[in-house]
Amino acid sequence: MTDFAATGQLLGTVVAVQANFYRVQLDQKQGEIGEMGDRDSHLPYPPLLLCTRRTRLKKIGQQVMVGDRVVVEEPDWAGGRGAIADVLPRHSELDRPAIANVNQILLVFAVADPPLEPYQLSRFLIKAESTSLDVLLCLNKSDLISELEQQKVSDRLLGWGYEPIFISVKDGINTDQAGKYLSNKITVIAGPSGVGKSSLINTLIDSAKLRVGEVSGKLARGRHTTRHIELFELPNGGLLADTPGFNQPDMDCVPEELIYYFPEARKRLAVASCRFSDCLHRDEPECVVRGDWERYEHYLEFLDAAIAHQTQLHQQADPESSMKLKSKSKGKGQSQYEPKLESKKYRRISRKTQLQDLQELYRDEE
């Protein structure tokens, strides 16, 4: 194991990336005042250094992501600068959002204002499950519904395979309980706009001071107030990543794998097997998944979307394909794919082009 301290190098975590600069938070055990020599007293503790990437890393194509564990050398304590010399191996990597070494996803929804929408929640849960990370579900604005209503929602989600934590950022209900699940982990917070994600981060981390958007009355969605990915240090250890808001996650998973993103379906497959190994659980005989579970209709809709997405990718990869697909809104936050004709092939020929063709024809006859 490399002794980074002996070589004058430091270990840290990339907490933000902007342009070609990387903000690196050094490990506390390597950030003791006695080891930092002429460290400027105005630097935070543990110190944050604004770093560049070594040319060697650029040449070998080594990208640096938020969440990366990195080796920093030649620290300039007075200027708060440094250089990233190496990137340690990642144990997980997300592409959207682009973040490394995540341990879990904190999914935040509101139970009221806007009301909880099962289809939208299910879509976010599927996307979270597809990362193979642990999923923690928090339901905000619980002060707006009764305890009886909370119990009904809880029972329903337990049937889905999730035990929600009811919180109220406004009234400070159970926010400390939610914070305990985040200690000593890198957590990505996600969910639709307007449900209180930024407010929750502001509650958990006073230094975050994120801009908070109100819910838009027209679409019952909040304004997208988060512009870039950033990790915030939690008081009890751990880092929390706020990600740029998105309304509907893409259903870009492999159709054959989709069923495993439903915990209630995984339970069925754990005790029995379908007759066919490539069963998609629609109308195949002797299927052990198809049945009277609540989200089965969600599964069928998501399966259609996943198949359409996969078909679109195959057709885009085939330059000889004359049939493309385009996304068309169905309303209620849903979309479907339909054939798209190639404009060049089916576009009406202009009169100018027709005249030029006739002139060429006359010349050929002469």
Regions found by a protein language model. Give the residues of each.
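Helix-rich effector regions associated with P-loop NTPase G domains
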Residues: 3-8, 61-66, 74, 89-94, ...
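Conserved Walker B
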Residues: 111-112, 141-142, 169, 243-246
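Catalytic P-loop NTPase motifs of RecA-like helicase/translocase cores
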Residues: 115, 145-146, 173, 247-249
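Canonical P-loop GTPase G-domain recognition
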Residues: 143-195
